[in-house]
Amino acid sequence: GAAVLVVAGLAGTGVAAATTLAEPRHVFRDVVLPPFDVHQYASPLQSYRGYVKDHRKDTLFTVKGLPEGARIRVGTMDAYNGVVYDVSDKGVGSSGAFSPIRDNMSAGATGSAATLDVTMDAYTGVWLPDAGAVSRITFGGSDADALRRGTYYNDSTGTAIATSKLRKGDTYSVDTTIPRTWTDKQLDGLA
């Protein structure tokens, strides 16, 4: 009995040593990134009351280059679950479909070209203030590389998210196309 156990143990050790590779094991999960999931981040509306109540007199961020009448967008929500507004996850074209930033986003946009220079102050979080149909986002400062690698854009809604979070002092430039706006008088009678 004991001799059989010794032989089996030696055989098992020999097989294990012969089949163990000298090189480390490579698996896809080490190199393939999971898809971006916007639902990991709180809706920008969840912070809205805090900004209105606690930062009423504070400068949240500064934008230079914004054309007159253009609006800053922090997020675009198209779903409501009875408690909170959020982005939907209805696939391509939905407000939950984000992809990594790149040059030449929103290539077919029409309107007036503008370059916005944005500096963060009291505003912090993942939702990136922008305007219009963004074609390029360029970060500055010591966190520029981390912000660039962790920023995603939704071309359908014009919304951007920086997963490494914006902080006071962060700066970025946005090349964008501001769409034409219409007055009520211009639209009257067109329906």
Locate predicted features:
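Helix-boundary/low-complexity linker signature
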Residues: 1-191
